[in-house]
Amino acid sequence: MSRLKKRYLADVKPELQKKFAYKNLMQVPGLVKVVINMGIAEASKDKNSIQDCVKEMTMLSGQKPVITKAKKAISNFKLREDQPIGVKVTLRGQRMFDFIDRFVNIVCPRIRDFRGFPSKCDGMGNYTLGLDDQQIFPEINLDEVKRTQGMHITFVTSAKTDEECVELLRLLGIPFKNLPISVAA
């Protein structure tokens, strides 16, 4: 069992139960999955850009990503139907907790001029953040990077409200602006 999962079971769950006055421990929100998505604008011009992103995503997530394709053609973007436009990977279980642990303890401190993420969720208990550069991940070899590529990371939780979602992620160590940081155990 990963360090973050142990911390979630031992510290975070009881704290959330106490704060939101849940009667049953099964009502306490938890993480369901983490989705990492890279949209690749140059995919229509450069066919190798998709393969480069697949390789980088495999290194930083630990599993092979799915290539996403365009649902319909848009002539203004020179986009045809079924043309590859990005890659995504869904992490669950052990890999999810390992990724979040590395993200909080290694990647976030490497972000330049970082003051915390905004604490705005989507209203359904999910939180998405955007990164401008994949080079902040230690798994990526800087010599092999041909272009800087941003990504979106979505934390899908079983929380019913945004307040529960933000509190869960804060207790797991995600640094938010204007909120105290939960100290990692």
Curated annotation (Swiss-Prot):
GO MF term set: rRNA binding; structural constituent of ribosome; tRNA binding
Record's keyword terms, sorted: Ribonucleoprotein, Ribosomal protein, RNA-binding, rRNA-binding, tRNA-binding
PANTHER family registered for this protein in UniProt: 60S RIBOSOMAL PROTEIN L11-RELATED
InterPro entries according to UniProt: Ribosomal_uL5 (IPR002132), Ribosomal_uL5_bac-type (IPR020930), Ribosomal_uL5_C (IPR031309), Ribosomal_uL5_CS (IPR020929), Ribosomal_uL5_dom_sf (IPR022803), Ribosomal_uL5_N (IPR031310)
Protein name: Large ribosomal subunit protein uL5
Subunit structure: Part of the 50S ribosomal subunit; part of the 5S rRNA/L5/L18/L25 subcomplex. Contacts the 5S rRNA and the P site tRNA. Forms a bridge to the 30S subunit in the 70S ribosome.
Organism for this UniProt entry: Protochlamydia amoebophila (strain UWE25)
GO CC, alphabetical: ribonucleoprotein complex; ribosome
Keyword 4Fe-4S: no
